[in-house]
Amino acid sequence: PDLPTRMEIDGAPLDPVQGLVLMLNKPLGMTCSHKEEGALVYDILPDRWRRRDPAISTIGRLDKQTTGLLLLTDDGDLLHRVISPKRHVAKVYRAGLARPLTGTEGALFASGELVLEGEDKPLAPAVLEVVSPTEALLTVTEGRYHQVRRMFAAAGNHVETLHREQLGGLVLPADLAPGQWRLATADEVASIFTAPESVG
């Protein structure tokens, strides 16, 4: 059965059992790595949760300037299933661009032939959905370093804002404000491994 999404005793969150999955709306300016300077996403969690064993870790990362859906878990098997290249879990990003789209980006990103600067292996095909002249949704199935930003750079543009809206079929809940988190239900976790629907 699903766990309640939030349990409290005297107003303080109760420690959930092992195998928890948290959905966080990552705010701007927070990092996912202890190796970087600045506020960590883990700082949002109750202090004692950060001392759990096994430790809570992010499932993949979002860079400091990227906002949106970030999952955290103490389930190592789930973590590796989600980030495994064999799973092809899709990630949907909303990108705000410095310059209007030219109309050529969709074919370039879908070609499976785009090679990012400094790399040898082409990117897997990605799907571009135009929202406005300077805004687009991009669905990718890989997690290369700063991939979305570098893809638009390869197309002659610059990403000014980047927000992850979906991971597989799991959509960032509309009622989860930046910096807020809650426990994911079993159905929500299962939806990670389904195909995303259009969120435009």
Question: Predicted segments — roles?
Answer:
Residues 1-200:
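Basic, flexible Lys/Arg- and Gly-enriched helix-loop patches that mediate nucleic-acid binding at interfaces
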